[in-house]
Regions:
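Residue-level signature of catalytic and energy-coupling elements of molecular machines
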Residues: 11, 131, 193
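Short glycine-rich anion-binding loops that position phosphate/pyrophosphate groups of nucleotides
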Residues: 16-18, 88-89, 134, 209
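A short, polar/charged loop-to-alpha-helix boundary motif
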Residues: 154-157, 213-219
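Active-site nucleotide/adenylate-binding loops and adjacent lid/helix of ATP-dependent enzymes
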Residues: 41-183
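ATP-binding N-terminal substructure of ATP-dependent carboxylate-amine bond-forming enzymes
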Residues: 1-50, 54, 69
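Short amphipathic alpha-helical segments
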Residues: 23-26, 133, 218
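Active-site flanking residues adjacent to catalytic metal/cofactor-binding acidic residues
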Residues: 13, 84, 120, 192, ...
Length: 219
């Protein structure tokens, strides 16, 4: 890592499933964008939701789950249907189990294979959109028009641009993304997934990269 850092001027990364310990070594040698804090938050679902709700943004109701007792309490508080997810390394529907009734709890917990998990309540939404936004070292923020996402079997199938949004929803989505970028003192490109609901926009997740819903931006 030291040899690599000394051979370059700036360091970046293309996805979030890398150890933050590597950045601990590298950041002492070269600038890293996006920064370590952004990586640490985005790769842990609990840390991510704590950060987002700390900004006053809305997420799905959630609770940390480390065992059967935690899960029972979380279900009692959040209700069903809900979804149990590993806090780390889950993507494209992996590391997830639906809990339609409390009777599904034991099976869902077993599917986590002992990993720390988070229970998330189901959200009633009309559609999902994502904002691909970038922030420069000078603090300026720019964003592409939000795209509308359709998933099949937990995997992104299509992204259509522009998304079906009212002018105010479109503005709110971009401003929300900018708020996240600024709070992280972020430099680079980020994908922000949002649920469009009758009560407003709900943040699903953030990604410290050009999210797969933003691959169209290369064209």
């Amino acid at each position: 890592l030291t040899a690599f850092a000394k051979a370059v001027d700036v360091i970046t990364y293309e996805f979030e499933n890398i150890p933050t310990s590597a950045l601990d070594v590298l950041e002492a040698l070269r600038p890293i964008h996006p920064n370590r804090r952004a990586l640490g938050i985005s790769q842990d679902r609990i840390a991510e939701k704590d950060f987002l709700t700390g900004l006053g943004l809305t997420t799905a109701p959630y609770a940390r789950v480390t065992g059967a007792e935690d899960l029972a309490g979380a279900i009692a508080g959040i209700g069903t249907p809900a979804i149990l997810k590993t806090t780390r390394l889950g993507y494209d529907g992996k590391g997830q189990a639906r809990i339609m009734t409390p009777d599904d709890a034991a099976t869902a917990l077993a599917a986590m294979n002992g990993a720390e998990a988070v229970l998330e309540g189901f959200i009633t939404f009309s559609h999902e959109v994502s904002v691909i936004a970038a922030r420069g070292q000078d603090g300026s923020v720019s964003a592409y028009d939000p795209g509308e996402n359709v998933h099949r079997a937990g995997i992104l199938h299509t992204t259509t641009v522009p998304a079906k949004l009212t002018p105010s929803q479109r503005t709110d989505a971009v401003l929300l993304a900018a708020r996240i970028l600024n709070a992280l003192d972020y430099v680079g490109v980020m994908g922000v997934e949002l649920f469009v609901t009758a009560k407003g926009l709900i943040v699903n997740e953030i990604a410290p990269r050009v999210h797969n819903s933003g691959h169209w931006t290369q064209n």
